[in-house]
Amino acid sequence: MPEDYWSAKDYQRNASFVPKLTKDIVKRINLSSSDELLDLGCGDGVLTNELVSQCRRVVGIDASPDMIKAARELGLNAYVIPGEKLLDASEIPSESFDVVFSNAALHWIMRQPKNRPIVMKGVSRVLRTKGRFVAECGAFGNVSEVVGSIYSILLALGATKEQIDQANPWFFGSEDDYTRMLEEAGFHVEYVENISRPTLLNKDVREWLDTFAQHFYHAFPQWKDIIRETVYNALLVTDCRSDGKWFLQYRRLRFVAHKE
């Protein structure tokens, strides 16, 4: 089990915008009252809980024990299962769901190249024939100003690119990346797009980093404060409006595929 850097309280304080910006992808699930849905990377369960009334059964899984604790406190049926373990997870029977849904999670789950086909096969295993895989995640180019700043700072401080790559917790794939991976796992891709979605932060980019960039802090603890303050000062120019509101340049990859 990977180390758990997540805090449900911090997430709700600094990233409550995440479940609020899901209207478009939730529409594409096209849920019916008879559907059984698995939420892959359910986090604190806030969005998952909104889906409960729309279908027959909802189950959530996530790699973070703290997030699953928060999801269970909402009354959800949720398990600590990393995405790459779904293929063999005894808690989740094969062909037991009509829909696998994932929001803002695949760019974490798919970070390691070796895990990508395993995750896709796991999703296929738990879906019934013609079942749907509907997801939104960080796309190629997502928060590129943040990623570029972090790499530039750490390279200037003496870290190697290989060390930074090892610390980087994200995989922001392209439409072609996901189409290929889905098709190789036996899915038919009905829809895929990469869209721009500038996103208003709850506070400033430092709190965003504290929530989402913990992996860099833990890999380079001696430079945590430098990363935090230098990214803040650099992005004041590009991502902070004159009224003090911060917008990061999010790009989202959305897809709908079904198991053949």
Swiss-Prot record:
Its EC number is 2.1.1.-. It is an enzyme of class 2 (transferase). Its main location: cytoplasm. InterPro entries: Methyltransf_11 (IPR013216), SAM-dependent_MTases_sf (IPR029063). One of its GO terms (molecular function) is S-adenosylmethionine-dependent methyltransferase activity. Pfam families: Methyltransf_11 (PF08241). It is found in: Cytoplasm; Nucleus. Keywords: Cytoplasm, Methyltransferase, Nucleus, Transferase. One of its GO terms (cellular component) is cytosol. Belongs to the methyltransferase superfamily. PANTHER family: TRANS-ACONITATE 2-METHYLTRANSFERASE, TRANS-ACONITATE 2-METHYLTRANSFERASE-RELATED. This is Uncharacterized methyltransferase C70.08c. The lineage of its organism: Eukaryota, Fungi, Dikarya, Ascomycota, Taphrinomycotina.
